[in-house]
Amino acid sequence: MKVRILTVGNKMPKWVQTGFDEYHKRIQPMLTTEVVEIAAAKRAKNPSDANLAQYREQEGQAILAAHAVAGREQLWVLDVKGKMLSTENLADKLSDGMQQGDDIALVIGGADGVSPEVLAKADVKWSLSALTLPHPLVRVVLMEQLYRAMSINHNHPYHRGN
């Protein structure tokens, strides 16, 4: 099983890269992961609602193109309106995917959200939190949760939950 993280934006602060790299390194023996950075649409200084829709559309087309390159993989989209999963639920979903041989493309949208086209094609809409999180932080939280879920599946002592 492989998880590709399709993420809009590519200039992350050093602290984000450091945190992400730490969990990326730890997870490698348990799960193959790859990051595909998608350029954010160029934004106007004071964008209108129409501009925001155009940005989402442009980024959405790039996300779907990156997803199409891999062939068959489940499309999971991070969305505030998605279903919340406990870490244990995530571990179960990843375990099921591994048994079925499914690869996953996990989408972190742009600053203005994800296009309706991407949401319509999503196999899973997942909310990390009811809170609005900054996109750089989402990268770190996502990788840590993937690592935590895989540590559960591999009986690693990292997770000390129920």
From Swiss-Prot:
GO terms for molecular function: rRNA (pseudouridine-N3-)-methyltransferase activity. It is found in: Cytoplasm. S-adenosyl-L-methionine binds at L78, G109, L128, S129, A130, L131, T132, L133. GO terms for cellular component: cytoplasm. It catalyses: pseudouridine(1915) in 23S rRNA + S-adenosyl-L-methionine = N(3)-methylpseudouridine(1915) in 23S rRNA + S-adenosyl-L-homocysteine + H(+). The keyword Cytoplasm applies. Pfam families: SPOUT_MTase. It is an enzyme of class 2 (transferase). SUPFAM superfamilies: alpha/beta knot. Its main location: cytoplasm. Keywords: Cytoplasm, Methyltransferase, rRNA processing, S-adenosyl-L-methionine, Transferase. InterPro entries: Alpha/beta_knot_MTases, RlmH-like, tRNA_m1G_MTases_N. CDD domains: RlmH-like. The keyword Metal-binding does not apply. Its EC number is 2.1.1.177. PANTHER family: METHYLTRANSFERASE, RIBOSOMAL RNA LARGE SUBUNIT METHYLTRANSFERASE H. Belongs to the RNA methyltransferase RlmH family. Specifically methylates the pseudouridine at position 1915 (m3Psi1915) in 23S rRNA. Homodimer. This is Ribosomal RNA large subunit methyltransferase H. The gene is rlmH.
